[in-house]
Amino acid sequence: MEYDEKLVRFRQAHLNPFNKQLGPRHHEQEPSEKVTSEDTLPELPAGEPEFHYSERMMDLGLSEDHFSRPVGLFLASDVQQLRQAIEECKQVILELPEQSEKQKDAVVRLIHLRLKLQELKDPNEEEPNIRVLLEHRFYKEKSKSVKQTCDKCNTIIWGLIQTWYTCTGCCYRCHSKCLNLISKPCVSSKVSHQAEYELNICPETGLDSQDYRCAECRAPISLRGVPSEARQCDYTGQYYCSHCHWNDLAVIPARVVHNWDFEPRKVSRCSMRYLALMVSRPVLRLREINPLLFNYVEELVEIRKLRQDILLMKPYFITCKEAMEARLLLQLQDRQHFVENDEMYSIQDLLEVHMGRLSCSLTEIHTLFAKHIKLDCERCQAKGFVCELCKEGDVLFPFDSHTSVCNDCSAVFHRDCYYDNSTTCPKCARLTLRKQSLFQEPGLDMDA
């Protein structure tokens, strides 16, 4: 009789826990259903009659006390069983108190179940490494430990158990399952040398102009939060839903160029990616947008003078073999527009002007360039000028602070000498006389 009771308990421990049609009453064997001696089953160890039952149920995430024992081996080898166990575990997580230890343990159990499910998947179902969609170029990420958030569904990406992609153009991150739900093209397609900023401060048009829908995904929104909260982007002035606007902060270009205001404002995800890609693009012509800004920001005047001097130094380096070998102009490789013009600025330039870093770094580069031309290189020294007005022996260069340059012939003079002589250039006068003499000589020959 004792052997039969052990045998009944053993069979109960090895019943399929996913068969919900069998209730607990159905599991109990009737006296007429006693097992015959033909079934040869191993004898349970004495003192632990119910150990296997609780461990098996615990491993599948279906036991009544999910947290009495640590996670053991997963005995289920069927994909369907694991998926059902995952659904059961998810339901348990929702029923448990928030931030409780039991809920955290259940989340760990859910991760293990999903890992087991991932191992059982067919290897032929692997995702491709590159996906191209709406001008996005998505690459499959290999990092398993970095915690990210999906830009489409606004949920956490679990790198250990989920396949996820990142766009190389705009850094858009999403689950593999969310790729086909993306409706907006990559913002990098709008970013080019001809791209422009919105230079009106928060150009709001109202929710009615958007038909009370999100400007990006067209989901219904309202200022009252029903059905979804409307969040305004300070860059575009439009309203977005909470999935497209995460209250990210960014510096607004319009507020910088008009008010010299660098306080970050809330922007949508799309605007944040666009501003991040545009931050180093030199597309702001400050003297046309707001010429009065140079009257109120002294650092901008200093930066403009340094840039003008560097442009005057550039011809020396282009014709100097030593400067080309030393690659001096590469000191400004991060700001190539500084050796092309003195008018264009990027938001990154203005940010560093505001923080006081650009003036210091540009002064160091200016000093390095001037040292090469005036002290280190004899060829560059030979290209200097002597003031033709005072005939003094010091060598002048167009980027010296005490000099003036003729706009017509580019001759260099002392500033005081040039203005004392009513800005009359002797070199231009000499060239004019030479031209006149050349025109007069053919006429004299014809008269003769």
UniProtKB/Swiss-Prot annotation:
Family matches, as InterPro entries: C1-like_sf, DEF8, DEF8_C1, PE/DAG-bd, RH_dom
ZnF locations on chain (Phorbol-ester/DAG-type): 135-186, 365-425
Disordered, as annotated region: 18-46
Domain of life, per lineage: Eukaryota
Sites bearing Phosphoserine, chain numbering: S437
Family statement drawn from the similarity comment of this UniProt entry: Belongs to the DEF8 family.
Functional summary from the UniProt entry: Positively regulates lysosome peripheral distribution and ruffled border formation in osteoclasts. Involved in bone resorption.
Protein name listed in UniProt: Differentially expressed in FDCP 8
Source organism phylogeny: Eukaryota, Metazoa, Chordata, Craniata, Vertebrata
Encoding gene (name): Def8
